[in-house]
Swiss-Prot record:
The keyword Signal applies. It is found in: Secreted. Coiled coil: none annotated. GO terms for biological process: defense response to fungus; killing of cells of another organism. It comes from Arabidopsis thaliana. The lineage of its organism: Eukaryota, Viridiplantae, Streptophyta, Embryophyta, Tracheophyta. Belongs to the DEFL family. This is Putative defensin-like protein 146. GO terms for cellular component: extracellular region. Keywords: Antimicrobial, Disulfide bond, Fungicide, Plant defense, Secreted, Signal.
Amino acid sequence: MMKNQFQLSLIILTFFILLELGVMGNVQQVKREQCHTVIPNKSGKCIFTECKSACEKLKKPVASLCLPPKTCRCYHFCS
């Protein structure tokens, strides 16, 4: 009986530790701020591949967005 209670307590403790680690990991990810850089689009048209390749030349892009007229917005994490 005592062994079963100890095992149950250990399982519950492990569960809460893992839950806390997951929550703390999510909080740290949320704290990372996103920045964006606006760069001119060479062709003057919204071509997704052109924006994507222009944004990839910047530091660690997360996403790229083509905005009319003639601009690309590159999203990345602030350093």
